[in-house]
Amino acid sequence: RQCVAGTDYGYKDLCNAWKAEKWEPEYLIRLYYDMGARYFFAMGQHHDNFDCWDSPYQPWNSVNIGPKRDVVGEWAKACEKYDLPLGVSMHGSHAWLWFEIAQQYDANMTKEDGKGKWWEGYDPQDLYAQRHTPSRGWEDAGTIHSQWTWGNGASQPSEEYKMKFQNRVLQCVNAYHPAMLYFDDTVLPFYGCDESVGLNILAHSYN
């Protein structure tokens, strides 16, 4: 139990502290299957913008940092063994907004700030994506719920941010071939500001 609201120990450090030392995906999938599960959803990324697979588009991922394991890949392998359809959930589109509260802490750090530290060579902006003017009411963490569809004063995501999210999802689809995708969005990712990203992902997944 670490406090992550500080200028030194931030979310980036929590990612590194996660080791998953007792995680046994094959044992768990067998257990779920024996209990009657007929599909399984793995967490691909949460609002923290950290990818739980060997992602070439997001260096802050579970292979490079933390457990040093391909979490989605190991889930996928176990699911294949038990013929259990795999789903992957993607929650990262809103990291642009969710991490604004961290601009008070370490979310404005850059790659240069990591010199001599465990995260040397990694750019915190790849994780936090906070080099932008924050949304209206950003100091109140509850405001984001009224900005879910990118309205009500929400800061609009950059084209680079949207394309990076799209590339990450498409690469995950190509690498692990999930039978299902879940997006923690009202309709599709970036609905309300740019429908093309979600439609591109949808078309690629079906085709």
Question: Model-found features: residue ranges?
Answer:
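Mature catalytic domains of secreted/periplasmic carbohydrate-active enzymes
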Residues: 1-207
